Amino acid sequence: MRVAMYYSNRDVRMEEIPTPQIGPGEILMRVEASGICGTDLLEWYRLHKAPLVLGHEVAGVIAASGEGVEHYKVGDRICAAHHVPCNTCHYCLSGHHTVCDTLRQTNFDPGGFAEYLRLPGINVEQGIFSLPDEVSFEEATFVEPLACVLRGQKLANLQPRQSVLVIGSGVAGLLHIQLARNSGVDYIMATDIVDYRLEAARKFGADVTVHANEYIPGCIRQTTGGRLADLVVICSGAESAINQALESVERGGTVLFFAPTEPGISIPISVNDLFWRNEITLTSSYGGSPADYAVALELIRAGKIRIREMITHRMGLAEIGLGFKVVALAQDSLKVIIEPQR
């Protein structure tokens, strides 16, 4: 089968490898759509593992099922989680499923940028979701990123009538905007350095958009009657985004560290200025649990999140190198979908 083998952001090669063989309890998925995620381009995180087949935002059709698979059949339309928890360890029982050791060890074989992938037994048991007829394959690729956003806002304890600042208006930021708007918040400000994405932020529900080079705390105060943001969501890995977030959070508010940064970046905290008498909460989130996936899929099915308008590029598997360039440039683009069957 054809795969897109990742060597670096500038070197993604079409290669042929054997189609995975499945065993008892496993499923072979024919991949119909796979989204390029910004984390696919984190060379500091990916290069030491290369060469490898990336792609974790996937949807497709069951091409074969192993002995003992009971709840799914060949031809079923599905999306799948690449990481799944054990549901029995200390972390899972504490509600922190996405820091489970099992979750960190599970994955697809080989990855979503391939014509086919193998779903191991534990993924079949906990990480497969049947697609309703009204959800397309390309829409289903958003289940994974939306699940991550859901988990982040849950851990940040987002409440109705709060004010929200989203720093970085890429795909994750736009999903945060839409989900926060669905949650009944009073006010959303979004920032970015790209005008195209600021326009997208307004389109998807931000009340105010501001270029990230502006003095963000001052802009918030001007539009909220003097208050800062109750929740600040950092959807940019830039060090400047962290500084902006810490300066922009209201007393009693929360900063959610959602996007990863390069290694070595630290948080510039003045403990007294930030915490003493201010009750500021700093929190983070990683990934989504199977329960988050289920909620995300239902939101998409119900039309609560506008997915199709976020897809700006659709490409065949052989065009994935161009897809990586489009995502890396981050200009007139949002989500790039790869269709491995063409």
Model-derived regions, located:
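C-terminal hydrophobic helical "lid"/dimerization subdomain
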Residues: 3, 243-247, 290-342
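Glycine-rich beta-strand-centered segment in the early N-terminal region that forms part
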Residues: 18-34, 45-90, 132
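Residue-level marker of beta-strand positions
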Residues: 57-59, 77, 91, 116, ...
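NAD(P)H dinucleotide-binding glycine-rich loop of Rossmann-like/cofactor-binding domains
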Residues: 86-167
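Mid-domain Rossmann-like dinucleotide-binding core that forms the NAD(H)/NADP(H) cofactor-binding site
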Residues: 135-214, 218
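A short acidic, Gly/Pro-enriched loop at the edge of an enzyme's catalytic core
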Residues: 220-229
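Glycine-rich phosphate-binding loop and adjacent beta-alpha segment
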Residues: 238-302, 339-342
